[in-house]
Amino acid sequence: MSLEFTLRKHGIDPHKDLKLIQNIDFANVASAFGSGTGDYVQLFEPQASIFEKEGRGRVVASIGVESGELPYTVYMAKQSYLNTNSEAAQKFTNAVYRAQQWIATHSPEQIAEAITPYFKDTDLAVLTSSIKRYKEQSTYALNPMIEEKEWKNLQDVMTSAGELKSPVVLDKLVNPSFAQQAISSNSTGNTEPPVKKSTTESTDAGVGAGGSS
């Protein structure tokens, strides 16, 4: 959806002005492009940097930057779970915020070293350049809050793609109390259960905006 939104933003109709290939499984997109399918491809890091290093492609634009700030990655839970496991949810959100702060205050080299065990098949230099690109693009959220403007932008993207029939207010699906508590306590171990403002079966989104390259 964000790709289509970006194309429309630049006056390109994704269904008339080009052939948009959408029948390839996500896990096989990179290999399909590497085998000659398509002229452009939307990839996440570190795959984009791997292709550049191998001379199989070059990053020409960031869809994350072009589409604007979005709550691209979130954590969700049913209200029923939050009602009975608020302490666990708070500790989890605290950890997310502390990780976000750590990323914001450390270099791409330091971050790459820390996450290397999760990318055992990726060269450290490639991993570092991937993180550097994301940091330069402000891809990483600085806190777990989802702001109104980011929520509206997400709905604009979904509406443009025909996936959203009518707007949804932020507080209908997002419970910000856990993120607010994490920020206010600076994640120092305060796990006081946040006050619930709703008993409806809604979801809690725990990570704020982050684009993609």
Q: PLM features: residue spans?
A:
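Alpha-helical structural context
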Residues: 9-10, 54, 118, 161
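Conserved C-terminal helix/tail region of periplasmic/extracytoplasmic solute-binding proteins
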Residues: 155-213
